[in-house]
């Protein structure tokens, strides 16, 4: 086995973190992060999303590295369409949840200073705590990982000659993706902690 260059590991990690900040990833995880007012819980949702995403990348990466194949373009496009439909469904669900929870804002002033406060009147009678959908977040990450796997694996196949180096690269990329998603979901939830 050839020596794994540290620069490739670092590059894989940084690409994973950057990958988490892609617009479609932010849109997907924001639908979960917006449903709670805890940075810790949002971070966990991001972690599970990143874990699902990384599992998909790892499984497809293993197949591609083992068989030395690429994903056909028609399959890649089909997976992208599935992710697009999933994002629309998540967006509609977020709008319906905001409506159900009666999220709104109030304009008012303190002396000369005018500002806006957002808040919610949840439509539950007993104000029961909702269980966070960690498995849902992981499933969305898994589906998202299927769609993004083509670009990652082409990059890996072009850059490395060894199965093991490719596998380690995908694992490091996944760890970066998980760390990035935890950061993204924490940042997104910050305003909701103030509601």
Language model regions located:
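Divalent metal-coordination and catalytic microenvironments
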Residues: 22-25, 53, 88, 144, ...
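Alpha-helical multi-pass membrane helix bundles of inner-membrane/thylakoid proteins
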Residues: 96-145
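Membrane helix-loop-helix hairpins that form the core translocation module of multi-pass transporters
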Residues: 11, 41-116
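Transmembrane-helix boundary and interhelical-loop signature of multi-pass inner-membrane proteins
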Residues: 61-86, 156-166, 171-174, 179-195
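Juxtamembrane helix-boundary/capping and inter-helix hinge elements in multi-pass membrane proteins
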Residues: 32-42, 159-163
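Small-residue-enriched transmembrane helix starts and helix-helix packing motifs
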Residues: 1-20, 42-47, 128-143, 168-173
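Select subsegments of transmembrane alpha-helices in polytopic membrane proteins
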Residues: 48-56, 136-147, 180
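Transmembrane helix boundary and interhelical junction motifs in multipass membrane proteins
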Residues: 21-27, 146-154
